[in-house]
Amino acid sequence: MTPADLAELLKSTATAVLSEHALDTSALPQTVVVERPRNPEHGDYASNVALQLAKKVGANPRELAGWIAEALTKADGIASAEVAGPGFINLRLETSAQAKIVNAIIDAGSGFGHSELMAAHKVNLEFVSANPTGPIHIGGTRWAAVGDALGRLLSTQGADVVREYYFNDHGAQIDRFANSLIAAAKGEPTPDDGYAGTYINDIAARVLQKAPDALSLPDAQMHETFREIGVDLMFSHIKESLHEFGTDFDVYTHEDSMHSTGRVDQAVARLRETGNIYEKDGATWLRSSSFGDDKDRVVIKSDGKPAYIAGDLAYYLDKRERGFDLCIYMLGADHHGYIARLKAAAAAFGEDPATVEVLIGQMVNLVRDGQPVRMSKRAGTVITLDDLVEAIGVDAARYSLIRSSVDTPIDIDLALWSSASNENPVYYVQYAHARLSALARNAAELGLIPDTDHLELLSHEKEGVLLRTLGDFPRMLKTAASLREPHRVCRYLEDLAGDYHRFYDSCRVLPQGDEEPTQLHTARLALCQATRQVIANGLGILGVTAPERM
């Protein structure tokens, strides 16, 4: 019996009790919540449903809790139901009911924990979207990990997710990039507003390999040659790095296409139709302050050139016209102003601002030997995705970046995350999976297979804790998806790994020496099989490997 099953039982029981006592059944909340008490001595689960209902239906909370508890004790799978405090209901499950989660996990396999919670949604998930002027830096790497994990997480809940990279190939930064390449190719100093670093020299040399006469071309043609080839080379490197990191995209949208295909003009025309565009001081303005932004925004500047927001407007409209009912943007710490701006853009088009969600990620700091590792893209000392992977590996890099809420700055201790110790969270979780895999191999050598026919034998305290944690997985995924918080998967896996290690230390799974195998051994093997499956499922959502051996 999962927490969701128990919640449904509690709701149906409470409904029957209210009816029996001629009380208002409509007072019941849409969802009845059961929680695991902090003190296991209070039971397996607890609910405050009686406290929620009492005032609404005019009943004494303890008396109402008593009625519900008495009815619950007659239900299949409930070992006891007791009233505590002002009206809490503490519940204990029968072992056989609790252990049914093992069957559910084994039957569902890699699909365990999936639901149709978001089946009605077509989601555009835009993340990373770094300028093609340099390698992916550590901040962008955080989004590469978190964004990919969020996409996987939403997919487990039935959402149709498209991962999209907005390719910023329009604007002044691309011109500065091209000028930096030209200076490097000529052996000249980097322009004051340019990009520096060995990667600039490398790309400049590769441009000359592809276009040996580039430096002898007229200035405009030379600039365009370095711009076009340089951007293509840089972005190829970005995509390759992301792929090796385990992050791939379904769609790459070029910012330049928003301008070259007339999408910006179409967006402005659409806004004129809604009356949310006006002219002032020779410029074209969006009435964004009417929709929650702190001020109106210039869309077309007085010189006739589109402002940056023009591309954003066209891009949002493009997404909506492609059928996305939810557009999630994952942006850096310096983009807080974009939350109101993008929601205002949606409202200006006559769309629901709720179709736009903006997640803001905080800074990532690397620490080596207790000292921060500095980064500066323009100074050429940028810490890149490739650097992080080289230092601690793909799995540790992804896990370390996903593990904390995105609105929290994080420090990544390179020594910790590269260590083979229980203090390293990803090692701790992966070791649990490897340990379970070794156990399965050893069982096979003994001719033992998991057996779910006698799960009622799983009555040890540590077995009960492990079963309840396994049962939490589907609900945790729903919560993590609803809140857009994949870090919850990491924290759950660490709890599950800890519960498994403690179970393993207390409960012998395989017979020793000449000991005859028993039904308890094979029931514990089934519990281990289920635990291994859930760990693999969770790591899969994170894009982290589940090793068979370590």
UniProtKB/Swiss-Prot annotation:
The keyword DNA damage does not apply. Keywords: Aminoacyl-tRNA synthetase, ATP-binding, Cytoplasm, Ligase, Nucleotide-binding, Protein biosynthesis. The keyword GTP-binding does not apply. GO terms for molecular function: arginine-tRNA ligase activity; ATP binding. One of its GO terms (cellular component) is cytoplasm. Its main location: cytoplasm. Its EC number is 6.1.1.19. PROSITE patterns: AA_TRNA_LIGASE_I (PS00178). It is an enzyme of class 6 (ligase). It is found in: Cytoplasm. It catalyses: tRNA(Arg) + L-arginine + ATP = L-arginyl-tRNA(Arg) + AMP + diphosphate. Disulfide bonds: none annotated. Coiled coil: none annotated. A motif ('HIGH' region) lies at residues 130-140. GO terms for biological process: arginyl-tRNA aminoacylation. Monomer. Belongs to the class-I aminoacyl-tRNA synthetase family. This is Arginine--tRNA ligase. It comes from Mycobacterium marinum (strain ATCC BAA-535 / M).
